[in-house]
Amino acid sequence: MEENWILKKLDLRSENLGTCLAAGEWIETAGPMIESYNPTTGELIAKVQAADKKAYDWAVQSAQDAFKSWRMVPAPKRGEVVRDLGNMLREYKEPLGDLISLEMGKIQVEGWGEIQEMIDICDFAVGLSRQLYGLTMTSERPQHRMYEQWHPLGPIGIITSFNFPAAVFGWNATVAAVCGDTMIWKPSELIPLVAVAIQKLINRVMADHKLSGVFNLTVGAGEIGQQMSHDKRLPLISFTGSTPTGRKVAGAVAERLGRSIMELGGNNAIIVTESADIDMAVRAILFSAVGTAGQRCTSTRRLIAHESIIDNLIDRLTAAYKTVPLGNPLDPSTLVGPLVTERAVIKMQAAINQAQKEGGTLLVGGQPRPDIGPLFVEPAIIHMPNQSPIVREETFAPILYVMSYSELDEAIDIHNDVTQGLSSAIFTDSFRMAERFLSHSGSDCGIANVNIGTSGAEIGGAFGGEKDTGGGRESGSDAWKGYMRRQTNTLNWSDELPLAQGIEFG
């Protein structure tokens, strides 16, 4: 059976420990067993024991102890450790990707792609380990030198969501590691097996380098996340999840004057102009809207089409939606797998009903498919007369709301008139329209694309958004600065003691 092969290949059992610290030490706790279910079939895959308060404290202590020595390892040497982690992930890319499909429900190529994304960020972090640059400034005082340098921040907390159980951890963990930080990881309690499998591979790499305590794991529910948020021993919390939960986490961290990186909701839109390549737009919208069953932070949820082409675009999209195969995500012919929980199915149905009450017309999909599995729902397209309240909400499901516009200013106003600000895109062959969309008066999102969809961000750019999306940045570019502390230094190599601003004292 394929499921058994996946578990055996990744050294997973029917019951697994969920707390790992120090030298790859897995510890038993008084925490409950978390049951992981296959969303495709509803059947139990395996169990993972949750951390309790005592185990959590041990994990933090492990990270604190390791930080004292890890921060002193030269950054390029830290990069060598991350390079070996990337190579380990290459070796286990397919079984890890299959486990994501099994436990979370995204299709196989997306599961493999997620592990590739973690491999890519390892490669990026290796290069970054030799590029943690500071600046040199000119002092106004003679024979003085000023510069800034970046120091490791400390043990940090990483709280990840169910939809990208490997990649988002990789964005944070690999960059933090080369920056000299140690960490505690709390994965989503919905997808604990992926975290346990990754931690076991990390342990092998750390053992090869005779290191311990840099990466620590505490599987658990919200209680563990609450402890992390309030814990002054963790100067930074990186949180990926819903906006309501993110507000609570950010508030708790801010109350203790800690740092937070928030990657929260996205109500992402694509504008399709009258000059757009419709063939290209249809392909991009389809992938962005139904990929991962609409459970990406960057999934396209709103389509804003010019009035002259909207009918043609709707006809093309509805025809494409009718051909999308739903099924077992480990079947290569499947394009859409299940939603992750029954609660997600209920929320999707409620949103469709509410959209219809607000004047929307259900054009295609939206029907539960219990004949395939308990959590399958057909991706839906709903034509809306305007951007009503339900459209302004983020429903984490494959629902695409379609609206029309006449002038680009109107389209941009509709686009920006939501509380979220993660990803956005425009399809156009007009240079002026593209530049307008990317300008100060265009998209207000952290990510803005031209002639590609809202999903599929590369690791080289900083990932994150504005407004209720949280303002945090992860992954590439200079996001690494969030994991370090900046220090400004002044050196006096003269025989005098001049003061700044020409002040004379005494």
Where are these regions (language model features)?
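Hydrophobic face of amphipathic alpha-helices that form TPR/SEL1-like repeat modules
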Residues: M1-T41
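Residues at or immediately preceding the N-termini of alpha-helices
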Residues: P39, K53-Y56, A75, K93, ...
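Residue-level signal for inorganic ion chemistry
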Residues: G42, R78, I100, C122, ...
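Conserved C-terminal structural/oligomerization subdomain of aldehyde/semialdehyde dehydrogenase
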Residues: E43-A46, L211, L234, I271, ...
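Short, well-ordered beta-strand elements within core beta-sheets of diverse protein domains
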Residues: I45-A51, D65-M72, I158, I270-T273, ...
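Glycine-rich loop-to-alpha-helix module at the N-terminal edge of alpha/beta enzyme cores
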Residues: I45-L132, Q143
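Rossmann-like NAD(P) dinucleotide-binding subdomain of oxidoreductase/dehydrogenase enzymes
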Residues: G134-M280, Y405
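ALDH superfamily catalytic-core signature
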Residues: L201-R204, P244-N386, L408, D413, ...
